[in-house]
Each structure stands twice: as C-alpha cells, then as structure tokens.
Amino acid sequence: PYNYFIINFFTFSLFFIFLINKNNLLRKNFNYFKYGWLFGFGYFFASLYWITIALTFDEHLKILIPIALILIPSFLAIFYGCALYIFSFFKKNKNTSLALIFSVLFGIFEFIRGNILSGFPWNLFVFSFSNNLEFIQILSIIGTYSLNIICISFFLIPAIFILRKTKSEIFFCVIFILIGIFFLIF
C-alpha cells in the first residue's frame, strides 16, 4: 500500500523465507492457511483503515467502525489463507518453482477476490506501482491481474537470492531483475 513498492520486496521476501524455513514445523496444511490469513489481515488492516474515516462523519455510523476495521480485513484475509493452503500441497524442494507457484496462487486468489460476491478489486499488490506510470503502461497489453502476478514474482527475487541453492536460481534472479529494470526504464 501507500505507493511504496519497495515495502513489498521486504514483506513478500520475509514472508516467503519464513514459510520455506518453517516448512518442517508447518506439518499441518492448516498452519499455512493460518499464516496466510495473518499476512492478509495485516495487509488489509493497514491498507483499508481509510474506510473507518468515512464512518466518522455521522454519529449513527460510528458504531460500524469496529466492523469495518476488523471484519473486512478478516474476510479478505481468507483469500490469502486459501492461497497458502493450496501452496502447502506442493513439494518444497526448488525455491524458484515455489516462488512462481506462490505468485500464481496469490494472483489467482486476487482475481477471485476481485470477482466473487460482486468483487473487491481494491489493494492489489500491483497498485503499489501506481506512481510509476512508465511501469504500468504494460497494463494495456496484459491486464491488471497478470501484472499483479509478475509483480509478486518480482517481489520474491530477494527471497530466491537469499535461499538460493543452485546457480540457475541466481541466473533467474538476474534475468528477472533485468526485466524489471527494462520495464522501469522504458
């Protein structure tokens, strides 16, 4: 949120490293759901606070502030929990493929969140690039949800680099960084 895309490099990378390092401790698939839900709740709690400000103008609506502040992020976090629940069924042996699976699952559940129950397409991770108009020009070609998957993959590069096991993973990081620089320049 807040158009500071650099924050996503830290949050996604640290979260992905946490999941990979806790793989042996997270024996139950529900634990992945729990951590995904907590990640989503924190994200939506921090980025949807502004809804409560709209409820302060009328005295009768102030009673809805706790509902808007807690229940909306709680509900939306279920989608991230479901994404990580499905992620838990994949074998944890190659970090590059896991990062791509992680990105695709998050992207799919962002799409579902944006279209189910009349949709809630707010706060996609790609929106953190909204101040970089040059970067988001590709939206006219591939669409918001596709760029969202690419951005999540891009945000996981530091995690892949930290967790690297082979030279091919370093090569993957370099290629993806070059693609990102290309998009930022052109």
What label would you give each PLM region?
Residues 1-186:
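Membrane-embedded alpha-helical bundles of multi-pass enzymes
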